[in-house]
């Protein structure tokens, strides 16, 4: 005889419902009220080519306090070596917020977060794509900028130099205007680089982020996207258009042909005609243009503007 008691169906339904509700409740994140921080959170982002660089940090104010200075002996003795002295609970009146020769979070609250989507050069030194905590060691005449492999730490209190991915040197610059709230900026920016500036009080600390080969980084991502979407004829066409803009017509034709092979459309045939024309292959361009118009009419596409362009091609007006 079965020793288990039968559970009435209605009771079983109730038990299951309560169980599911309890599980859902357990998965709900806790409710919290966001505090107002004296050092407010900020983020700045710059794209170089197709590489995104994002810096997330907190912005402490000066508020008349001494910022950059040598640590007095009493302060220095608390944490010897490079260890951070950035502890407001230990700091005495008149002591600097950022004492020289000690690790600083380059912000407030959590360690400053530096994220980059591709491999880059920092002041000419290689840094892999990834997320890093950014720390500095300030000095009167030279600063060390540190990219550390522990991105989730609070301040620099658990900073471990063994986890450093990169250290670079830079020269601080005195400026005339006072920056009350610490600020990161990207300026100047070029086609393949951006200068990051840490500004606070009357000091600017710059370092450069460079993408070694912008076009190769773009091509690598383009190839990966096309490989992941082999039936999408638009993607290789987009690559073809980019190469055409660079006047690299051989590569442009290679990709537009790939698009046509995937699926022949008025859009990619007309694009090929324009590329051939730009490359100086006028007879091939006109033949392809006629094929594009025929394809467009068959697909009920609007070919009017392109037909006018082709007429100008044939009349020698372009």
Residue ranges, per PLM feature:
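Extended, well-structured beta-strand/loop surface patches
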Residues: 56-129, 135-232, 246, 263
């Amino acid at each position: 005889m079965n020793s288990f008691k039968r559970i009435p169906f209605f009771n079983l339904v109730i038990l299951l419902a309560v169980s599911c509700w309890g599980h859902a409740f357990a998965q709900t994140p806790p409710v919290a009220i966001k505090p107002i921080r004296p050092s407010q959170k900020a983020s700045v982002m710059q794209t170089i080519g197709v590489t995104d660089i994002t810096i997330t940090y907190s912005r402490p104010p000066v508020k008349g306090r001494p910022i950059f200075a040598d640590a007095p002996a009493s302060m220095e003795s608390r944490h010897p070596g490079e260890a951070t002295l950035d502890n407001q609970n230990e700091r005495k009146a008149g002591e600097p917020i950022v004492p020289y020769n000690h690790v600083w979070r380059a912000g407030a609250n959590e360690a400053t977060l530096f994220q980059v989507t591709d491999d880059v050069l920092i002041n000419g030194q290689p840094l892999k794509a990834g997320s890093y905590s950014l720390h500095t060691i300030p000095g009167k005449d030279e600063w060390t900028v540190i990219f550390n492999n522990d991105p989730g730490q609070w301040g620099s209190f658990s900073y471990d130099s063994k986890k450093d991915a990169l250290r670079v040197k830079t020269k601080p610059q005195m400026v005339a205007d006072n920056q009350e709230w610490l600020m990161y900026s990207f300026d100047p920016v070029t086609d393949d680089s951006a200068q990051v500036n840490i500004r606070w009080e009357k000091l600017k600390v710059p370092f450069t982020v460079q993408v070694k080969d912008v076009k190769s980084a773009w091509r690598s991502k383009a190839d990966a996207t096309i490989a992941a979407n082999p039936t999408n004829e638009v993607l290789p066409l987009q690559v073809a258009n980019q190469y055409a803009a660079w006047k690299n017509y051989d590569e442009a034709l290679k990709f537009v042909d790939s698009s046509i092979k995937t699926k022949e459309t008025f859009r990619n045939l007309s694009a090929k005609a324009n590329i051939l024309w730009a490359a100086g292959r006028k007879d091939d361009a006109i033949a392809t243009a006629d094929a594009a118009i025929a394809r467009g009419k068959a697909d009920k596409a609007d070919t009017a503007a392109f037909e006018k362009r082709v007429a100008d091609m044939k009349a020698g007006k372009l």
